Structures are given as C-alpha cells and as structure tokens.
Amino acid sequence: MTQTWQAEDGAEAALAVLRAMVTIANSTVERNTEQLTLTQFRALRVVVDRTPVTMGKVARELALNPSSVTRACDRLGTLALLEKAPNPLNRRETLLAPTGAGRQLVDRVDRDRRRVLAGVLRRLGPGARDAAIQAFERFAAAVEAEESDARSPLRRAT
C-alpha cells in the first residue's frame, strides 16, 4: 500500500487500517460462508456473543432496521444456524440462540481471521509487530471507552 496521505491527527492512517480490516472481515466471511451476506453473519455473531438475545437487541447492536434483522435471522433459521423461541417474559418478543452449526461457523471465521491477521503481523519486524499489537490494544480500549461514553445517560442529555 502506497502512503499518499499524511495527517497530524492520524485519522487518515486509521482509515487506511479500517479499510484493510474491513477487507479481511469481508474476505473471511466470503471464504467460510458461501451462503451468507455480511449482515447475516454480523447478526449471527451478535446471537453467538449475547445468547439468549431478542431480535430488537440484535437490531440495536447492529444499528439496523428491525425488519432487516428479521429477514437476516429468518435466513439464518432456514440454514439451521440459529433457533427462535418465544420470550416467556414477553410474548411479543422472539429469543434467538445459535445452533451448534451456527457456533461452529462463527468459530471457523474467527480462526480464519486470526490466521490472516497473524500472517500480516509476521510481515512486520519484531519491533514494529510489538508496537502494532500495543497500538491495537490501546485503540480497542479507547473505542470501548468512547462507546461507553456514547451510551452514558449524561452524554445523551447534553
């Protein structure tokens, strides 16, 4: 990748990394799930990570329209990657849980992503690799803090 950008705040460098990560995310989903769209896989990921979860929670987590999530989850159900059940506490809600095949699929994509990322990191020298890993850890923590602040009732009130 040719560096044609320079920005003091690092936003352009971060955007370049984001594009590379999205490419990895897309290619690993395509390679491991011929039948799923990226949105369907993202919905399955939320179900695996948050079981049991409602369709509404999946829609909020992915910032998608509930009808889009319903269609994605219907497809996942047809492929036997998730199961649906009525919520015993609220009959208007449907609870979602992954099947064994759904969990295995998410695990397979995760293994492929780890393999690809490890290959990219191996291309860096030891010092650059260690610095990149530390930067990833700090960046992930900063994103988590930013997301937490965004959900804060105090921030929404301002």
Enumerate the language-model features and the residues they cover.
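C-terminal regulatory/oligomerization modules of transcriptional regulators
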Residues: M1-W5, D130-T158
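Amphipathic, non-membrane alpha-helical segments in soluble helical-bundle scaffolds
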Residues: T4-L15, P66, R103-V106, R129
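Short, locally clustered residues in the helix-turn-helix/winged-helix DNA-binding domain
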Residues: R19-V22, R45-D49, D110, E137
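N-terminal helix-turn-helix DNA-binding core of bacterial DNA-binding proteins
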Residues: T23-S68, C73, L79, L95
